[in-house]
Amino acid sequence: MSNLKNFLFTSESVSEGHPDKVSDRISDMVVDSFLSGDPFSRVACETLTTTNKVVLAGEVRGPSIKEEDLIQKVRECIKDIGYDQDGFTWREATKIESHLHAQSADIAMGVDSSSNKDEGAGDQGIMFGYACNETEELMPAPIHYSHKILRLMAEDRKSGKLKNIEPDSKSQVTFEYVDGKPTKVKSVVISSQHSADVDQAKVRELLKPYLLKSIPEKFLKDFNEEELYINPTGNFVIGGPDGDCGLTGRKIIVDTYGGAAPHGGGAFSGKDPTKVDRSAAYAARYIAKNIVASNIAEKCLIQLAYAIGVSKPLSIYVDLFDNDLEKNKFVTEKISENFDLSPRGIREMLGLNKPIYEKTAAYGHFGRVPEANGSFSWEKTDKKDVFSK
């Protein structure tokens, strides 16, 4: 984020019913399906969703899964999200194709471990992790509250409490920063698909309460309601994959820090944990979050770089945003001493060879609560004492 002290900063989120997020979820369901049968499966699954059609394509190596079983799981994903519309439904009207095939032997050769070397990275690339003390979850405020608005809407929609609202929604929150700290909300945008029998006044009445439910009152003092934009273009009846084609991996900023930190360009969903696009980004967040949780820095940016077939990162970059070279050196040394950042080391450190990915596909991969089954293990702060001087 900018080194300016006083500024406006905006982040957006999209709901689980957004067409790209439908695709992300289906791709991560495929990852979980293979990892359930073999924790060392290899998966790279892309999903396209459009009007009454879903297409899976990619490379896999692992247990044999019947195509009809995978197709049934796709329908279960669509049903859970909430789609049962003329243009996109979990029922037979939506046609599902699978074009998954075996992983390239050339890629496997570079990644598999052998007797004389550790397993290499699945590809070259750069990955970033970030944390800051703007929220309890150590996430930037704009993306955190953008996610929260949509997550609460989805919970109420699925429970039946929020009626006439359909699965496809977007949010956007602008914060005013003073002396580098978020002080108040400047504007909020909520756009949501709705049933055809409600007008925009009713939609506003239904969705306005989620502003107060999601954002702490201290940030809403003197909020001008004219800056609350709900469905600013009017009717939003046709939505989801029927309104726009969805593809896996197109919401990488929503998935991470809302633009508050750099992104290496690699998407997460549809990839097993040997892919450092995913696992190393999780590790970088884990390190950054523990650094900030230790109170040695108010915010932290980590960059990792890898080469295909090489087990150790080519570089580790640390930015604590305070120009304290001695502290930066101390933190960098502690990372090298306490974190195995080889692909295998990351997977073992965070327990990533588990079917834990489908639930990451919506509302952000970061700022979530670690669960007993290993989900969101990269959000733990169990290494914060490593960075205490």
UniProtKB/Swiss-Prot annotation:
Protein name (database record): S-adenosylmethionine synthase
Entry-linked PROSITE patterns: ADOMET_SYNTHASE_1 (PS00376), ADOMET_SYNTHASE_2 (PS00377)
Coiled coil location: none
GO BP term (any one): one-carbon metabolic process
Keywords attached to this entry: ATP-binding, Cytoplasm, Magnesium, Metal-binding, Nucleotide-binding, One-carbon metabolism, Potassium, Transferase
Residues given in the record as L-methionine binding sites: E59, Q103, D244, K275
Species classification: Bacteria, Pseudomonadati, Pseudomonadota, Alphaproteobacteria, Candidatus Pelagibacterales
Annotated catalysed reactions: L-methionine + ATP + H2O = S-adenosyl-L-methionine + phosphate + diphosphate
A Pfam family hit: S-AdoMet_synt_M
Binding site for ATP: H18, D168, S169, K170, D244, R250, K251, A267, K271
